[in-house]
């Protein structure tokens, strides 16, 4: 095992269009085979489309609202105690909750039936900002699992 400890977190380069590290993370999640410009085109197209479809109905960008609706507060982790494995509910750290939310958003976008990835991502963002869609359902399922296993919370570490 290495003795140096964990590698330091590298600062995220903000994207040039929105100046947001969140958008940079989203681009990196969409990225396939190192094709960064293609990933940027998909993400920027989806964000512009989401803003256009959302219109002046709400202030702020739909991606922020979508992320708030997707980020999990609790999750379950397996803990082995005396031969039995318990699903122990634990709070999710902010960095992990963002990473999970982006992973779910992109994953459920890929599973959608629209023609282009830009449309899929845009519609998943719009659904998530309205509290619908697969990513929001995954968050609800995660919270339900944590609630159902609340009895094992004392095994937290």
Swiss-Prot record:
Any one Gene Ontology BP term: translation
MF GO annotations: rRNA binding; structural constituent of ribosome; tRNA binding
Gene Ontology CC: small ribosomal subunit
Top-rank taxon: Bacteria
Coiled coil region boundaries: none
CDD domains: uS7_Bacteria
Keywords carried by this UniProt record: Ribonucleoprotein, Ribosomal protein, RNA-binding, rRNA-binding, tRNA-binding
Membership in a protein family: Belongs to the universal ribosomal protein uS7 family.
Quaternary structure and interacting proteins, as annotated: Part of the 30S ribosomal subunit. Contacts proteins S9 and S11.
General function of this protein: One of the primary rRNA binding proteins, it binds directly to 16S rRNA where it nucleates assembly of the head domain of the 30S subunit. Is located at the subunit interface close to the decoding center, probably blocks exit of the E-site tRNA.
Protein name: Small ribosomal subunit protein uS7
The organism of origin for this protein: Micrococcus luteus
Organism taxonomic ancestry: Bacteria, Bacillati, Actinomycetota, Actinomycetes, Micrococcales
């Amino acid at each position: 095992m290495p003795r140096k400890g964990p590698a330091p977190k590298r600062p995220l380069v903000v994207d040039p269009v929105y100046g947001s590290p969140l958008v940079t993370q989203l681009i990196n999640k969409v990225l396939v085979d190192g094709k960064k410009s293609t990933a940027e085109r998909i993400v920027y197209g989806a964000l512009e489309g989401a803003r256009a479809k959302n219109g002046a109905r709400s202030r702020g960008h739909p991606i922020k609202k979508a992320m708030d609706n997707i980020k999990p507060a609790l999750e379950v982790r397996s803990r082995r105690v005396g031969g039995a494995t318990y699903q122990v509910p634990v709070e999710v750290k902010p960095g992990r909750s963002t990473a999970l939310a982006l992973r779910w958003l992109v994953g459920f976008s890929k599973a959608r039936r629209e023609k282009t990835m830009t449309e899929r991502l845009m519609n998943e963002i719009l659904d998530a900002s309205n509290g619908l869609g697969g990513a929001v359902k995954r968050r609800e399922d995660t919270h339900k699992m944590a609630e159902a296993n609340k009895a094992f919370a004392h095994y937290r570490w």
